[in-house]
């Protein structure tokens, strides 16, 4: 029984599904997808639960959410192992994900008050008030790269605001999704407030097609995000928040400490085996001897990165990709770039057949025409050389995406110029592209999102504002507008 609908664990009536560890092949989870009727059932449960949940005070909802945070803390080791085994991440990285989930609770509570709390301004004849109201029933689509943390970033603020939810995890991480839902159950969520439907494309299409849905919150690929946007077109009454991918540039200008810059680049391009939406995909490197030395050192250090299983000791920097198919797609992308004229500096290698263990790849594309503006979701870094900083900014902006961008340089003036001209939602200076603060908004422009950033701003798309003019009594104004006559004289 792997679906959680209206407080009950039930068996899916759709296609059967098996999840294996992407490195060892061990069977981790087996179950069935939700069919269209069960998706409808989950929606009815969420709709029925909404009025009572929304009418609870914020303090009452907060008690449940904070109880969930305590359960995350007490079950940190077990959840870390589940996420690591299912995604292929090393144990250390899965542990940081669970920590981020825990920290998200307090941050979301604070964001609720700052972004969507109540405000009141006194006026001579009353008051002006601002309140925020929940949308109703929201669908949350989760990604596989952070199957706990990223859905959590939608679910927690949505629940705090008073919404009820239907959650569909990625079909590649059903076990992590189920494990987190069981903790929410232990936290005491009333039946129907949060519902879990497992499944792939068919389940997702049934969920996004629900008429009685008030909104959809999505983190995932640009292709799927565009499909959802088209599916919900003509329905402005539904809130749609899309956080998609990026073809993110990292500009390496002047470098004082080459090893520090190489470390930052590896953290930007290859952490999580390149499976973060903010990962550097394009390295823009200044021409010259210093750039040559940096590139040689980057290749030398990257060659030493050996991916391993989630529980290997000593712990590896990177694990496997989410699947052997995903790893093969990266290799295919590299082969296509090489065929276009790219110069391979470090070839990505699948270490074993029937696993997703893939070493990083680096390929120089300077002077190659027609390079696709696509996100390769894995450890493959493309390199371009530039002569002037103005050229670097033009190259950085030469993408339909706009998620993250970074600069390595000692010059504040160049960062200030980048801040003015960059088209990206995250612009970092001497920090990895993959670094983002939960106390700031997270999202991009262009093909990276639809101007509804998550993290600190998630509260914004989880509630709508209600403005009020209020007075506890009604009296006739001392001064009336022209043409109004309230005298006692009878008009004949």
From Swiss-Prot:
Residues holding NAD(+): 220-225
Q: What is this protein called?
A: N-succinylglutamate 5-semialdehyde dehydrogenase
Instruction: List, alphabetically, the SUPFAM superfamilies matched.
Output: ALDH-like
- Biological process according to GO: arginine catabolic process to glutamate; arginine catabolic process to succinate
- Organism, per UniProt? Escherichia coli (strain SE11)
Q: Which family does it belong to?
A: Belongs to the aldehyde dehydrogenase family. AstD subfamily.
Reactions it catalyzes: N-succinyl-L-glutamate 5-semialdehyde + NAD(+) + H2O = N-succinyl-L-glutamate + NADH + 2 H(+)
Q: Which domain of life is it from?
A: Bacteria
Gene Ontology MF: a single term? aldehyde dehydrogenase [NAD(P)+] activity
Originating gene:
astD
Q: What class of enzyme is it?
A: oxidoreductase
Q: What does this protein do?
A: Catalyzes the NAD-dependent reduction of succinylglutamate semialdehyde into succinylglutamate.
Task: Give the residue spans that cross the bilayer.
Answer: none
For whether the record's keyword set contains Transport, the answer is: no
The pathway where this protein functions is: Amino-acid degradation; L-arginine degradation via AST pathway; L-glutamate and succinate from L-arginine: step 4/5
Q: Name one Pfam family in it.
A: Aldedh
Q: Which InterPro entries match?
A: Ald_DH/histidinol_DH, Ald_DH_C, Ald_DH_CS_CYS, Ald_DH_CS_GLU, Ald_DH_N, Aldehyde_DH_dom, SuccinylGlu_semiald_DH_AstD
Q: Where is the active site?
A: 243, 277
Keywords in alphabetical order, please.
Answer: Arginine metabolism, NAD, Oxidoreductase
Q: Where is the signal peptide?
A: none
User: Which EC number(s) does UniProt give?
Assistant: 1.2.1.71
């Amino acid at each position: 029984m792997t679906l959680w609908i209206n407080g009950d664990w039930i068996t899916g009536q759709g296609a059967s599904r098996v999840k294996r560890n992407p490195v060892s092949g061990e069977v981790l989870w087996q179950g069935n997808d939700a069919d269209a009727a069960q998706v409808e059932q989950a929606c009815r449960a969420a709709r029925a639960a909404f009025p009572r949940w929304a009418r609870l005070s914020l303090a009452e909802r907060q008690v449940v959410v904070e109880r969930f945070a305590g359960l995350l803390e007490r079950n940190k080791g077990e959840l870390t192992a589940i996420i690591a085994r299912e995604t292929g991440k090393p144990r250390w990285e899965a542990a940081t994900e669970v920590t981020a989930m825990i920290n998200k609770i307090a941050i979301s509570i604070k964001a609720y008050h700052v972004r969507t709390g109540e405000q009141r301004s006194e006026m001579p004849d009353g008051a002006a008030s601002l309140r925020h109201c929940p949308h109703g029933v929201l669908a949350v689509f989760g990604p596989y790269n952070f199957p706990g943390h990223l859905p959590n970033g939608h679910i927690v603020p949505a629940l705090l605001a008073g919404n009820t939810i239907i959650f569909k995890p990625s079909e590649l991480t059903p076990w992590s999704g189920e494990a987190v839902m069981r903790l929410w159950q232990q936290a005491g969520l009333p039946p129907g407030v949060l519902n879990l439907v497992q499944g792939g494309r068919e389940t997702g299409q049934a969920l996004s097609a629900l008429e009685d849905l008030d909104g959809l919150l999505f983190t995932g690929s640009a292709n799927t995000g565009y499909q959802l946007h088209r599916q919900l077109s003509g329905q402005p009454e539904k809130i749609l928040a899309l956080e998609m991918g990026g073809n993110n540039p990292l500009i390496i200008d002047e470098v004082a400490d080459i090893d520090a810059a190489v470390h930052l680049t590896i953290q930007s391009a290859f952490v999580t085996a390149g499976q973060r939406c903010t990962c550097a995909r394009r390295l823009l490197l200044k021409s010259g001897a210093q750039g040559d030395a940096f590139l040689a050192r980057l290749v030398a250090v990257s060659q030493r990165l050996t991916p391993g299983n989630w529980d290997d000791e000593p712990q590896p920097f990177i694990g496997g990709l989410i699947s052997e198919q995903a790893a093969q797609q990266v290799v295919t992308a590299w082969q296509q770039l090489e065929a276009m004229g790219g110069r391979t500096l470090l070839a990505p290698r699948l270490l074993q057949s029937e696993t997703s263990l893939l070493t990083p790849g680096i390929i120089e594309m300077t002077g190659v025409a027609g390079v696709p503006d696509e996100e390769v979701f894995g450890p493959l870094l493309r390199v371009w050389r530039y002569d002037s900083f103005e050229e670097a900014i033009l190259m950085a902006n030469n993408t339909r995406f706009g998620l993250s961008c970074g600069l390595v340089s000692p010059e504040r003036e160049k960062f200030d110029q980048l801040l003015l001209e960059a088209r990206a939602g995250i612009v970092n200076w001497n920090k990895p592209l993959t670094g983002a603060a939960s106390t700031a908004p997270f999202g991009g422009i262009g093909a990276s999102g639809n101007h509804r950033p998550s993290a600190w701003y998630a509260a914004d798309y989880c509630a709508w504002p209600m403005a009020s003019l209020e007075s506890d009594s009604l009296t006739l104004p001392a001064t009336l507008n022209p043409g109004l006559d309230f005298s006692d004289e009878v008009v004949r």
